[in-house]
Amino acid sequence: MNTALRIEIAMKVMNMTEIAFRRRFERPRISRPTRWMFADISIILPGDGWTAIEATFISVMSRKFTVMPPIKIMNVFLGSKARRGWPYPGYDYLGRAREWIAELEDLKSGLSFPVEFVNETASTMDDVRRIEKEMEDVDAILVYILTSESTRFTYLASKAIARFGYDHIHKYGGYDVPTIYVVDLYGGDISALPLVEDLKNIGKKFLMISSSRTSDIARALKCIYTLKMLRNSRVLLITKREANPAKYLSPEYISRIKEKFGTDVRYVDYTDVLKLYNEVDDEEAEKLAKKIFEGAREIREPSFEDLVKATKMYYALKKLMSENNANAVAIDCLGWLEYDKTPMPMTPCIALSLLNSEGFVAACEADLHSAITMLIFRYLAGEPSFISDPVIDTARNVVIHCHCTAPIKFGRRDNPYILRSHSDSGWGVGIQVLVEKGIEVTVAKIIRGLEEMVASTGKVSGNVDVDRGCRTKIEVEVKDAEKYLYGFRGGLHRVLAAGDHLKELEMLGKLIGYKLTLEGE
């Protein structure tokens, strides 16, 4: 299929998505993932209720898009027919490798992102050296330790493969290739267990999967996918640095973010947003405002004219991302209100809510730590997330997560919402989203220094409707609110996403190099 036809199909699908979004954000559900393979390009409509093509592969903003290839995984199956060792002498490791390959193909078909496998087997160190020599650019190496023998081949080969990633840096530039070891139970265990300490001693970032669940391999692949997407992400930091000289907004700190996560951060001035805001077609903004206005459960403070200005801000920020090939923004909204001479035409709360619902990442208060955390949730969990100001109630053992920018799309569904003003300033348009009671949520944040992530899980016990504080207030049960309170650190904000993603966050931390600390335990 030629490129022009691929592009035409992609554009038609995205046009359908845009229409569905405008119809009160009601997207028809798909019973199972649908995969379209166009040569080396994969387009997926996930079977989780989303009709939007994942931003992973095609990011369409104002008719501009980027096609992302699938993640490329090299599977290396290590084994030998030794006279002594596990599973038993003369074991058919090649037959076992074929079984693994079949299992991996089945696993791949159920993923919500495309994966390309390159399969290799090795029974001698010469095979290992050949694989290293022939290895092309890959996103990760998965090493399957099938046997443990008296010659210690699989142990020594596994250590040698750990060096592939470092050599890859010099060959291709950029980052170490993540290495994931899979222990074939009752076969590779004796070789694998001593390997853990050895790899830690050389500072290797790796995962060791010793599990009878193939879903753990799927989790690892999701981490690789997230890593790749972080390295292909760009955040637009909308602020005035001279007016907001916080250390974590400095060029030096942004360089650390690039080094750690591979994510590009670019400074943008408020005047650039205002210019695009003034260029937005009023009729287009009014149409979207009408849909949002009619879809609200209740309108309290804002007028329809306020909402039109809010949708113009949405279109302006979306155009800004398009022009800068970005998929995320972090806007210093409170700073704009407080100290900038450029008048702010409207609070960006609704714009951020819509962008997050749509699959982009939009963070307020120029919070880069939260923006990176939101990007992680976007790709690791496949979920919109939002920044919160936590309120801790030790009497009821809950934390209430408050903000004015919550996405309407949260917990795999479109939630009821009330149109409000922005609470801090008392003007503009904010949003009060009422999320489903009983759903599991993960609360997390990369904290200052980028070496640690704090995280917790809990169930939504309700939505609080009081005028004090930010508009959306999601009440979450925690294990120990007292411990949560006295252990709180890393700045005010937290990021909330639907689902329990602690295991994936922990695995990702082992590959990126951050420590996961549980809050409130």
Regions found by a protein language model. Name each.
Residues 1-9, 14-64:
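N-terminal, intrinsically disordered, basic low-complexity segments enriched in Arg/Pro/Ser/Thr
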Residues 65-193, 217-225, 251, 255, ...:
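Metallocofactor- and cofactor-centric catalytic cores in central/energy metabolism, strongly enriched
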Residues 180-200, 359-377:
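Ser/Thr/Gly-rich flexible loops in soluble cytosolic domains mediating phosphotransfer, phosphorylation
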Residues 186-226, 378-405:
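Short, glycine-/small-residue-rich phosphate/pyrophosphate-handling segment
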Residues 224-256, 260, 399-415:
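Conserved anion/nucleotide-ligand pocket segment
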Residues 289-379:
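Long, internal scaffold/assembly segments composed of regular secondary structure
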Residues 356-464:
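C-terminal catalytic subdomain
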Residues 428-521:
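Extended hydrophobic packing segments that form well-structured cores
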